[in-house]
Amino acid sequence: MSTLLEQLIEAFRVLPGVGQKSAQRMAYHVLEREREGGRRLAAALGNAVEKVGHCVQCRDFTESEICTICASSSRDRQQLCVVESPADRLAIEHATGYRGLYFILQGRLSPLDGIGPRELGLDRLGERLAAGEVTEMIIATNATVEGEATAHYLAQLARQHAVRPSRLAQGMPLGGELEYVDRGTLSHAFGTRSEVL
């Protein structure tokens, strides 16, 4: 097998859920049938890796220092929704009428994997809460063991800054991930969130 082909297969394997066989199929498909698509993919990937960074306020992906949501004057700055990933933020934006701001953890607490508060930017979140503008923190972490532990930590952080923590409710399956929940369920869960005790 060609060394370049082996490198292409290994490159595809960095994607989540892509094993050896899937990576091999993708590599063969690009080389056999989609060379132009492969060129576009390589160019788009190169541009994104070089030019897309994180918003200094919410940690979402953006090409500028501050993302369009944080820069918008029409958003409710008293509400801050904390999510695990940009995909979760997108799911909430599409499924609900939420008009507040976000903070994206880019993960969840997982001490066994070496992911603690610092890796999730919780120092920056604490500074944002300390500024006094936020009155409600909507905790929208996934209903997994790590997500629940993260939610508990976030609720404590909110209370330290006199911010009311609330949590998504009803319809969110235990062990489920936000980006895979249908819009109706997510909209209902968002609308019926409850205060975290």
From Swiss-Prot:
- Give GO terms: molecular function aspect only: DNA binding; zinc ion binding
**Gene3D superfamilies assigned:** 3.40.1360.10, 6.10.250.240, RecR Domain 1 (1.10.8.420)
Report domain Toprim positions: 78-173
Q: Which Pfam families match?
A: RecR_C, RecR_HhH, RecR_ZnF, Toprim_4
Query: Which GO BP terms sit in this record?
Result: DNA recombination; DNA repair
Record keywords, A-Z? DNA damage, DNA recombination, DNA repair, Metal-binding, Zinc, Zinc-finger
Show the InterPro entries listed in the entry.
Answer: DNA_Rcmb_RecR (IPR000093), Rcmb_RecR (IPR023627), Rcmb_RecR_Znf (IPR015967), TOPRIM_dom (IPR006171), TOPRIM_RecR (IPR034137)
Its biological purpose is as follows: May play a role in DNA repair. It seems to be involved in an RecBC-independent recombinational process of DNA repair. It may act with RecF and RecO.
NCBIfam families reported in the protein's UniProt record:
recR (TIGR00615)
Its family remark reads: Belongs to the RecR family.
The molecule here is called: Recombination protein RecR
